Amino acid sequence: MSESKRFDREQLAGAMFNECRLAQAEFQGVNLADSRFTDVKLQGAVFTDVNLQDAKLTNVNLANVSIDDANISGLTIMGWNVAELITQAKKRNTSV
């Protein structure tokens, strides 16, 4: 039987998640600043009101992940700065 993984208002700044199965996990109000996710299965996970500042995600499964109301400043996924990508996409959309 699958165990539900819920992180509620946890202070996990600088945490390292390696080779974890966190599919469908719920992160609510969690501080994940400077955290590292490496080889982690996150499909279907939900991140709400979280701090992902300067977090790094490498070789992660992000299928159907939801990130709402989050600080993503400096968030890097597979070497890509997410906030910069969003800013560039918004600029392209307004110039069309």
Describe the function of each predicted region.
Residues 1-96:
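Tandem repeat scaffolds
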